Amino acid sequence: MSKTIVRKNESLEDALRRFKRSVSKTGTLAEARKREFYEKPSVKRKKKSEAARKRKF
């Protein structure tokens, strides 16, 4: 979980920018999107092999 404390004399936009940066660095949002719905193991394997095939070419 990411925490951002608003500093003294800091605008809300700057604090929000720091929060968004910390969330993207930790991968919290991407992980939540990935786990939003259950994915069968066979589908996971299929996606993994397709991604490897794309990386190869």
UniProtKB/Swiss-Prot annotation:
Keywords assigned: Ribonucleoprotein, Ribosomal protein
Record lineage: Bacteria, Bacillati, Bacillota, Bacilli, Bacillales
Superkingdom of the source species: Bacteria
PANTHER family (UniProt xref): MITOCHONDRIAL 28S RIBOSOMAL PROTEIN S21, SMALL RIBOSOMAL SUBUNIT PROTEIN BS21
Gene Ontology annotations of biological process type: translation
Source organism (scientific name): Bacillus cytotoxicus (strain DSM 22905 / CIP 110041 / 391-98 / NVH 391-98)
InterPro entries xrefs: Ribosomal_bS21 (IPR001911), Ribosomal_bS21_CS (IPR018278), Ribosomal_bS21_sf (IPR038380)
Cellular component annotations (GO), alphabetically ordered: ribonucleoprotein complex; ribosome
Recorded GO MF terms: structural constituent of ribosome
Record-stated family: Belongs to the bacterial ribosomal protein bS21 family.
Name of the protein described by the UniProt record: Small ribosomal subunit protein bS21
Transmembrane as UniProt keyword: no
